[in-house]
């Protein structure tokens, strides 16, 4: 069954009565969908649903920069503009982590493989007593790599930083491990 708009000159049709009802509100300027948490009202139920999410912390995060939002549409728009992976050596920017990693490995990998008796950073001349410490320094300071990842999406250059974060993060859990989690939100704040 098709549901047609009865307003003169409109002629739009809809597959469901609810969609027609929402459409009619655009003609009458009626706003029957009211938020039960604030005073805002909307012509369409879908707009109210999007609004209600704003009363709660955002759940969607950009994997590149950590930007948080409420809707997939907003996240998609953000990700189109987000060029968060920037090379700390040459300044090139990449939209995808995999492209950034390929760039680093193909253009700057000599830093990790150069034989030397002293372990000196080629970029800032800082000296290290171990090659592994130099590699960690270059990756985290100059290449801005963060290989240690939490299930919540945050990334860290050092495992110790991830360990500190893990003690506070509610997303981190393994069966059999007693991991400290933040206290539950109080209902009195709502």
From Swiss-Prot:
One Gene Ontology term, aspect cellular component: nucleus
Gene Ontology MF annotations: DNA-binding transcription factor activity, RNA polymerase II-specific; RNA polymerase II transcription regulatory region sequence-specific DNA binding; zinc ion binding
Record keywords, A-Z: Metal-binding, Repeat, Zinc, Zinc-finger
Disulfide bonds: none
Keyword GTP-binding recorded: no
Entry annotated with the keyword Phosphoprotein: no
PROSITE patterns for this protein: ZINC_FINGER_C2H2_1, ZINC_FINGER_C2H2_2
Zinc finger residue ranges, C2H2-type: 4-27, 33-55, 85-108, 119-142
PANTHER family in the record: ZINC FINGER PROTEIN 142 (PTHR24409), ZINC FINGER PROTEIN INDRA (PTHR24409:SF424)
Protein name per the record: Zinc finger C2H2 protein ECU03_0790
């Amino acid at each position: 069954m098709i549901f047609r708009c009865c307003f003169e000159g409109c002629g739009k049709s809809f597959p469901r009565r609810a969609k027609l009802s929402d459409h009619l509100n655009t003609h009458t300027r009626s706003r029957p969908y009211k938020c039960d948490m604030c005073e805002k009202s909307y012509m369409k139920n879908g707009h109210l649903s999007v609004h209600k999410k704003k009363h709660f912390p955002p759940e969607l995060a950009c994997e590149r920069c950590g930007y948080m939002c409420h809707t997939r549409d907003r996240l998609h728009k953000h990700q189109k503009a987000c060029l968060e992976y920037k090379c700390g050596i040459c300044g090139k920017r990449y939209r995808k982590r995999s492209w950034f990693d390929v760039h680093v490995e193909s253009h700057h990998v000599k830093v990790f493989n150069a034989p030397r008796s002293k372990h000196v950073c080629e970029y800032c001349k800082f000296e290290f007593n171990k090659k592994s410490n130099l590699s960690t320094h270059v990756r985290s300071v100059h290449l801005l790599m963060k290989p240690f990842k939490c299930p919540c999406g945050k990334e860290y250059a050092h495992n110790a930083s991830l360990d500190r974060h893990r003690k506070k993060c509610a997303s981190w859990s393994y069966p059999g491990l007693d991991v400290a989690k933040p206290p539950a939100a109080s209902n009195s704040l709502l």
